[in-house]
């Protein structure tokens, strides 16, 4: 067989293959290719938009850290501050077994007394002069208002070495039973939180206390929801 005949046979075979490709299956295959192309194009466009507008991709490290710190319990955040600065820090919680009084615990999980802070006679003792953040939270609960108004008080007081008298630094009054009319409604439980906080210039040896007029209404259902603390700034 001559070379020209061989080339001619190859050309005829190619023409036959092209003719078969343009047969009944040709339009179907073209349609599939077109659909596949558009799907890939749409997917690429969607991915670009998501990356461009920040819907997906690496998260901001600072924002993630702030969110994580916001979820930390109070004592963990206080402990973090203490570790970084080595300044006086105190965070104590109430004794749930103390009947009829608000008694702060010195040795318990989630209690922190560091860098000179101490709890003496149910009072936090300041070890050095400076600015301090003072805070406290009480949570009250009751089964009913007993058909009469109820005024709950929460105070944080200071006794300084320079003058041996108690002075209120922070105070608040709340009533869970306002406008109660005798026999006007059925008994229903109530809950009332009171949070206090402020920054003060304190002196070495100052004694701080947190009290309430109705300790019998304190809610100890959850550990750590009644607390008292001081942080040096």
UniProtKB/Swiss-Prot annotation:
PTM statement from Swiss-Prot or TrEMBL: The soluble form derives from the membrane form by proteolytic processing. The membrane-bound form is further proteolytically processed by SPPL2A or SPPL2B through regulated intramembrane proteolysis producing TNF intracellular domains (ICD1 and ICD2) released in the cytosol and TNF C-domain 1 and C-domain 2 secreted into the extracellular space. The membrane form, but not the soluble form, is phosphorylated on serine residues. Dephosphorylation of the membrane form occurs by binding to soluble TNFRSF1A/TNFR1.
Topology in membrane: Single-pass type II membrane protein
Domain (THD) ranges: 88-233
GO molecular function: cytokine activity; tumor necrosis factor receptor binding
PTM sites of type Phosphoserine: 2
A Pfam match: TNF
PROSITE patterns documented for this protein: THD_1, THD_2
Identification of the protein by name: Tumor necrosis factor
UniProt lineage: Eukaryota, Metazoa, Chordata, Craniata, Vertebrata
Protein's gene: TNF
